[in-house]
């Protein structure tokens, strides 16, 4: 009555063609990845060999890559000076003096000089905002208007009554 293997009806059955195809595709992808890894390892090995050959050749010729300036001085010497372990050499001091002598008048200008607001505001938007705030403060500080012909900048000293006394003041004015 039963007609055979019930496992053929299951989706996970390894004998089914669709499952065999999935397994084969995964194996192919893994093989391709392994091949790419091998190629990259060969490229890296070749690059290392070339660098070793160039390093041996460059030590005799002195080939420059453009980054030598970062490594020219001994960094520990600078640190020793900064930490107070070592004093400045006279050659360093002489170099600084020669540099000062070679400077033009324009380069001798103190770099801590005050930058005019006009130049500074062109570069910095917050400085522009600050100058506008300063201008507004200056505008608000207008002198007090003098009382009937007096020419003083002193604040008014006459008795100004609060608004709550408005009706009383109005009545006083009408009584005149």
Curated annotation (Swiss-Prot):
Q: Which keywords describe this protein according to UniProt?
A: Coiled coil, mRNA processing, mRNA splicing, Nucleus, Spliceosome
Region listing for Disordered, in residue ranges? 139-176
Top-level taxon of the source organism: Eukaryota
Q: List the disulfide bonds.
A: none
Q: Spell out the InterPro entries in the cross-references.
A: CIR_N_dom, CWC25_splicing_factor
| Nuclease as UniProt keyword | no
Please give the coiled-coil regions recorded for this protein: 25-58
Localization of this protein: Nucleus
Q: Does the keyword rRNA-binding apply?
A: no
GO terms under cellular component: Prp19 complex; U2-type spliceosomal complex
Biological processes annotated in GO: mRNA splicing, via spliceosome
**UniProt xrefs under SMART domains:** Cir_N
Functional note: Involved in pre-mRNA splicing.
Q: How does it assemble?
A: Associated with the spliceosome.
Membership in a protein family: Belongs to the CWC25 family.
Protein's recorded name: Pre-mRNA-splicing factor CWC25
Q: Which organism is it from?
A: Candida glabrata (strain ATCC 2001 / BCRC 20586 / JCM 3761 / NBRC 0622 / NRRL Y-65 / CBS 138)
GN (gene name): CWC25
């Amino acid at each position: 009555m039963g007609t055979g293997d019930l496992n053929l009806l299951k989706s996970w059955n390894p004998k089914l063609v669709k499952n065999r195809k999935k397994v084969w595709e995964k194996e192919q992808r893994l093989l391709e990845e392994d091949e790419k890894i091998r190629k990259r390892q060969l490229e890296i090995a070749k690059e290392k060999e070339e660098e070793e050959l160039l390093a041996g050749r460059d030590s005799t010729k002195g080939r420059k890559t453009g980054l030598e300036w970062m490594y020219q001085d001994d960094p520990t010497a600078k640190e020793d000076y900064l930490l107070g372990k070592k004093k400045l050499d006279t050659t360093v001091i002489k170099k600084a003096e020669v540099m000062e002598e070679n400077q033009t008048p324009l380069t001798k200008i103190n770099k801590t000089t005050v930058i005019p607001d006009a130049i500074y505001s062109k570069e910095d938007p917050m400085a522009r905002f600050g100058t506008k705030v300063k201008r507004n403060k200056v505008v608000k500080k207008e002198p007090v208007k003098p009382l009937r012909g007096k020419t003083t900048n002193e604040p008014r000293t006459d008795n100004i009554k609060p608004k709550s006394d408005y009706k009383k003041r109005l009545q006083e004015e009408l009584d005149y």
